[in-house]
């Protein structure tokens, strides 16, 4: 029995090291004001609830909403061009799953090129 306890105690630092580096994601902001505009194209995003994406700066408590993945990625590549912080400050990117419409972390999503399904901007 003692042997098993020591094995667990020896593995514990390894497990902590593996998972400690992974930052916990906060929940996405779910409330979008009716007058909220996409910082990239200027469209009203609340009209396109199924396509809304968001970028969050948790340190500054700021959220930017977009009318689709395309504008989210344009913003992510050069956020300062659209009034955002440096790219390293964008801690979270969120998109909606196409079928369930639930928020998922954008870095975990699978994106399809050449689909016949178009978002609000084509």
Language-model segments: residues:
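N-terminal secretory signal peptides
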Residues: 26-85
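Bacterial N-terminal signal peptides
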Residues: 8-18
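Thiol/selenol-based redox catalytic cores and closely related redox-interacting motifs
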Residues: 85-122
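N-terminal secretory signal peptides that target proteins for export/translocation
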Residues: 1-4
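Sec/Tat signal peptide C-region and signal peptidase I cleavage site
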Residues: 20-26
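Short linear sequence motifs
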Residues: 12-13, 59, 104
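A generic signature of intrinsically disordered, low-complexity regions enriched in glycine/proline
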Residues: 7-8, 25, 101
């Amino acid at each position: 029995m003692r042997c098993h306890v020591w094995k667990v105690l020896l593995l514990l630092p390894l497990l902590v090291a593996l998972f400690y580096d992974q930052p916990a994601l906060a929940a996405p902001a779910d409330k979008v004001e009716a007058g909220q505009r996409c910082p990239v194209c200027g469209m009203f995003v609340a009209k396109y609830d199924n396509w809304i994406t968001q970028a969050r700066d948790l340190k500054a408590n700021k959220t930017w909403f977009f009318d689709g993945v395309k504008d989210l990625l344009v913003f992510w590549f050069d956020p300062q061009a659209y009034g955002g912080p440096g790219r390293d400050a964008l801690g979270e990117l969120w998109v909606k799953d196409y079928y369930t419409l639930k928020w998922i972390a954008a870095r975990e999503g699978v994106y399809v090129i050449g689909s016949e399904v178009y978002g609000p901007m084509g």
